[in-house]
Amino acid sequence: MKAVIHNGKAGLLGLSVQDVPSTKPGYGEVKVKLKSAGLNHRDLFLMKNKSEQDPHMILGSDGAGIIEEIGEGVKNVTVQTEVVIFPTLNWDLTENVPPVPEILGGPSDGTLAEYVIIPSQNAIKKPAYLSWEEAGVLPLSALTAYRALFTKGQLKKGEHLLIPGIGSGVATYALFMAKAIGATVSVTSRSEEKRKKALKLGADYAFDSYSNWDEQLQGKKIDVVLDSIGPALFSEYFRHVKPNGRIVSFGASSGDNLSFPVRSLFFPQVNVLGTSMGSGEEFQAMLAFIDKHKLRPVIDRIYPLEKACEAYKRMQEGRQFGNIGIVME
């Protein structure tokens, strides 16, 4: 089967499309013939930090396809079922948070291939109203957004959500989900084009990430910040979050180390919360939520499997708005 392999050199230089053996599912596993898949910033992080001594891996956490073969002991799904892949491994109950969530696409083989073998409980019936391209980019980004907003951020109708750095799959899902429950949404971006797109998709306010936030927000305070930026903007949040507000962190695109006045945290009793990926329970709840509101992913571009390197380059350069998809045929 054809697969997107990372091996050897760090970054995109170690990326190639190769023919690799296709194996059979083991006990409790299913083999899915993939129709589509999606890229995530996590993939870039893995490639950047991989050494030449590390074993090769098939990238990709998101995907959708048709079950072609089932292993012994599988009773919850059948051959020819159309499925979307729940990418988190060994995390079923929301309360049982693992130290570091395991996920498809590093170190275990991922979805940027013609086939993938996964535990049967990770093969979830595909929402019928979604196209293959839409279903393929859905899983990790939508799950991350759902957990960040509702499990961790406890966002409610009428509250004000701030999404710094609009443009990623997670950010666009969060925009749709927040508007679906009746929240007010402000977004930031250095790109005027991305700000305009966000407003067309329903954002209430959009402004430059490095403009004067006091002027832009006009005194409006924030209930929840959904942060993927990290240190570049983090100290700014405390000036605009309401007392007892929530800052939910799921990324660190500008670096790992934070510095902010501690009194700005404890006097207004601001809650800083970390989140990553999500559980099986949350994945089912997310699918029910998007089905209820008939939410669809924003697809930036679709590439054939053979052009995965070109797709990753677009993501690395920060040009995307929404999800970047891969199709197998």
UniProtKB/Swiss-Prot annotation:
Domain of life according to the entry: Bacteria
Keyword field: Oxidoreductase
EC number from the UniProt entry: 1.-.-.-
Disruption phenotype: Cells lacking this gene show up-regulated sigma X activity.
MF-aspect GO terms: oxidoreductase activity
Class of enzymatic activity (EC top level): oxidoreductase
Family label: Belongs to the zinc-containing alcohol dehydrogenase family. Quinone oxidoreductase subfamily.
Name by which UniProt lists this protein: Uncharacterized zinc-type alcohol dehydrogenase-like protein YogA
Species the sequence originates in: Bacillus subtilis (strain 168)
Gene from which the chain derives: yogA
